[in-house]
């Protein structure tokens, strides 16, 4: 029997709070770039390990540090003066043993650097990766006891730590709007139509009773902005686009503010949020893994959260990754499939050395719809939790295929 517990939630629904704060750091924010690189390196290493060794070997690449460069954005152009410095650290197996006893080497540094550069090329479209970045790899090899767990690929892995993951569903209107705003502004179709908007977009949502204020910091790409008037017109256009989205996504009142640090008395570039590449990493904003969005893509101080970084951790036995992703999948399925469940949040706690499908506890807190009790939904919720735990190694395949969000 697994340690699954279903309880009635004691906190009131998020919608009944007068104040709600929700944040998302867009894909071009330096912290998100760090997360994305870490996860890209882990995914490519995992695929390489599986191809060469037959299974994923030990690694954790969740230590990426970005040190900002220096740039000189100008209306209609600009230049990079000093490249962005990117340091890849962590641990990864650099060899494996064949059944014959022969040892084969794996070029971890080369693989990691190539994965990082490809992520940057695919994500920050105005960044010349070769000219504008310096990527250095200092990934070492893990200890023998950690590597040994990965030599038993057909067993349920043992938990690498005593840690926990959390998840909840459904999103509130504010959470949904914040997430969809950033996703729209960073979508490929949007970038084709509005290339002046860079990828470094931070959306902060504040709900005060029935009123939402979205404060958006959006890096504009200087070569697409001719002068101050063009910048201000583009900012108004962006505001209208966000307001149109908000009208479709929520019935609450929404006020949109963009680049509120701008000084509109200035007639040159110094008063406005301009970048050469579309990310503030080019000129003064550093980044680190785990300092931004949680595994569901948001930062939500009104909700249960884990401080664990999910990006870059191995998908085999690192419960700091697996349990956060698992909690998100479980809660979404429960809300979608179990009649009578209004909302759910849950926590899954591991115990170091124990099988990851046997957590110390998997506890769900449920708010039921009117007319339903915990007894009415307990069996179905337990069944879903048990199903996901029973098939917990599927998370590995989802991660290798890039199907799950980690930031």
Swiss-Prot record:
Q: One GO biological process from the UniProt record?
A: S-adenosylmethionine biosynthetic process
Quote the InterPro entries the UniProt record gives.
Answer: AdoMet_synthase_2_family, AdoMet_synthase_3, S-AdoMet_synthetase_arc
**Which superkingdom, per the lineage?**
Archaea
Q: Which EC class is the enzyme in?
A: transferase
| Function as written in the Swiss-Prot or TrEMBL entry | Catalyzes the formation of S-adenosylmethionine from methionine and ATP.
Family in the record? Belongs to the AdoMet synthase 2 family.
**Alphabetical UniProt keywords:** ATP-binding, Magnesium, Nucleotide-binding, One-carbon metabolism, Transferase
What are its cofactors?
Mg(2+)
Q: Keyword Magnesium: yes or no?
A: yes
Q: Which GO terms describe its molecular function?
A: ATP binding; magnesium ion binding; methionine adenosyltransferase activity
Residues recorded as binding ATP, renumbered to this chain, are: 140-145
Q: What EC number(s) is this enzyme filed under?
A: 2.5.1.6
Q: Which reaction does it catalyse?
A: L-methionine + ATP + H2O = S-adenosyl-L-methionine + phosphate + diphosphate
The pathway it acts in is:
Amino-acid biosynthesis; S-adenosyl-L-methionine biosynthesis; S-adenosyl-L-methionine from L-methionine: step 1/1
Name used for this protein in its record: S-adenosylmethionine synthase
Flavoprotein as UniProt keyword: no
